[in-house]
Amino acid sequence: MVESKTPPRTHKLTDPPDANYRREVWQDFRTCCLSREASVIARREVLTGRANFGIIGDGKEVAQVALARAWRKGDFRAGYYRDQTLIFALGLSTLEEFFAQLYGDPYGDPFSGGRQMNCHFATPLVDAEGRWTDHKNRYNITADIAPTAGQMARGLGLAFASKKYRENPAIGGDFSTNGDEISFVTIGDASTSEGAFWETMNAAGVLQVPLAVSVWDDGYGISVPKKFQTTKESISAALAGMQTTGDDTGIEIYTGKAWDYPALCRLYREGVEKMRSTHRPALFHIQEVTQQLGHSTSGDHRRYKSPERLAFEEEFDCNRRMAEWMIAAGLATSEEIETIKTEARKEAGEAAQRAYRGYHDRVAALRSELIACLQAVQIAHADVPALGQIQQGLEEKREPLRTELVQTARRAAWALRKKDSAAKTRLAVFIEAEMSEGDRLYSHYLMSATPNSALQVPVVEALYTDESTIKDGYEVLNACFDHNFATRPNLYAFGEDVGQIGDVNQGLRGMQQKYGTGRIFDTGIREWTIMGQAIGMAMRGLRPIAEIQYLDYLLYGLAPLSDDLCTLRWRSNNQQAAPAIIRTRGHRLVGVWHAGSPMGMMLGSLRGMWICVPRNMTQAAGMYNTLLQSDDPAIVVEVLNGYRLKERLPINIGSFTVPLGVPEVLRTGAEVTLITYGASVRVADDACALLAQQGIAVELIDVQTLLPFDLPQICLASLKKTNRVLFLDEDFEGGASAYMLQHVLEKQGGYRYLDAPPRTLFAKPHRTGYGQDGDYHSKPQVEDVCEAVYELLREAGLA
């Protein structure tokens, strides 16, 4: 039986010390004791080999129960792996669920389904069908990530969503109550040295959003003391220049002691209530935090802390200090304190044992099933002595992991690879079932599988008439965005130079003037937090289009996309989604910093969002229309040198869609298949025209999206016809051209149809040189394509 979760807070600690006040204090102290015992047990379980890794929140218990009292339904958290006490205090986890995550139990871990290590929490923001849950009537925990300060930018986005909902309460629905929701962020003091922290605090001060950042200051970053981490050895002192002076700018700064329970309750209550009305961000610098059990189970803090520091940590243990205050205030006797601690120790121990047995009892049942399979194959194949050794190895494991069962079964199958019997078939069925279950447990939900998936959006062809006008490419985008802003009140666009001038290439020209500064707006030069704004907004039901001005600058915003946005649905086990659209432009133009096409980097780091590479602005518009109907995140890389090229404007510019993962055959031919995307399409098309003059018919395919890639296998169908293939792009060697080659030849089986070695054509290994001359000698040109195609044919004696 799973124990009940902690009841939600119903009583503020503002009363005189009557029975209600005493009961609430006792509840908080009991939560602190339960959390401490959970930490002690978690460390022991790892060090004795019963769990893999433990990172815990000892020493922060009192500050976190005080913080919990400032919460209201509808609030959000973007925290990190020290917040177990807060989660217990809010009633969002039982001890058994906490330990199930520690043991890596995918069935018992409600936060990540066994995908994340312990102390990484999440609550459902969407249901299994992708429908939004009621955010405003529950406590909302966004799925944790471990990269230090990685939660900061998401927290900014969550707070910014409150600002948007306050500006337009009509779209609040189940998401917001007048934008009153606070975004609570927690971070360790040493992690405030990260650039993401400073970028977030500056952005929060500029934007004036309800971001409440609690810094747990225990004096160290693992073993490195804060004198090497923070100017003045104090993050509140270092941030003093941002502190508000009473006007509508800056941030509030509060300080408190981690062991002073009544003062912390008052600090958080007053600070947070003020924030709900003003929307001014605040830093809560919680000092003199201790860490009784060290940083994690991978080390011992006695190696780097002085005897004096260790003595301080014992004396100022927050739980001990709270107990002393309760006794001095007449709220409890020393005997009652000991009883609470003893009961907490017992309750935590029993919960840990239930969680441990919950995992291993399931494995034990599978173990019995596997042993029966092994016994059967030994009878059927007595001439395979390895089977007995394999079974013996399994039986010697007292409490094997599920993986060890699968390994054992597969090794037995390997020993039987040349045999055949009903017993072997039974073993194969066991293996197939467990491999399938493992795939379900750990590999599903990278992308949306809901009815709202981008892959389920109906295809609507672009329509043209004889009167269809010819426009510059940017005007096509302009018309698309205009339609979507008119019909989607929760749609926003922002980035550097996006607002007043309508982006540097005019795709949003006039949109701010038409739809207001609240929906289309400029940001500072801060790519990390622009991405964070998009992530947090999208998690709260808004539809952001966030701009990275040039693809070359994606590196500044890559970490939050890769670590946070791309992993969100997967790491929350399909409980959370953020359908953010990242808009950027790239490929060839002039110079090192405006001609990037790092698609290989993106393919390696952005699994979990779609990568769209339209060849022109009409295709880009159709992709935006598709994505805005879906619940998947995506990045759209527009062609930087294509905004002034002429295109026909579809009459259904706001409603036609381009399906993701479906290439388009732009030229038909029977001699060579040429596969490319983005800006290289125009290069390839010009080359095909030259080749056609020589009687060489090339089949030109624009893949349109790299993720997903060619779902209907159009490239393979072409290769079956031509038997020769050239992959073209302007990434470096081994980048997207190699990726496309692997998909077509290996995954689609295209190698079977080759009459000549496959070719890739890519950029030089250096960055792009300046001007037309630099571009010509850095990236593939029309002449390079012609020569590569001719060489393919010449080698076959066809040219």
Question: Where are these predicted regions, by residue range?
Answer:
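Gly-rich Lys/Arg/Thr-decorated short loops/hinges at beta-loop-alpha junctions or inter-strand turns
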Residues: 44-48, 131-142, 179-183, 216-221, ...
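Thiamine diphosphate
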Residues: 61-62, 140-398, 404-405, 492, 510, ...
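Cofactor-binding active-site loop characterized by glycine-rich and histidine/acidic residues
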Residues: 37-214, 219, 225-243, 540, ...
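Short beta-strand segments
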Residues: 79-81, 149, 186-187, 214-217, ...
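Active-site phosphate/pyrophosphate-binding segments
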Residues: 576, 586-590, 594, 599, ...
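Short coil/turn connectors at secondary-structure junctions
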Residues: 23-25, 29, 50-51, 72-76, ...
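Conserved acidic/glycine
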Residues: 1-63, 69-70, 291-294, 298-515, ...
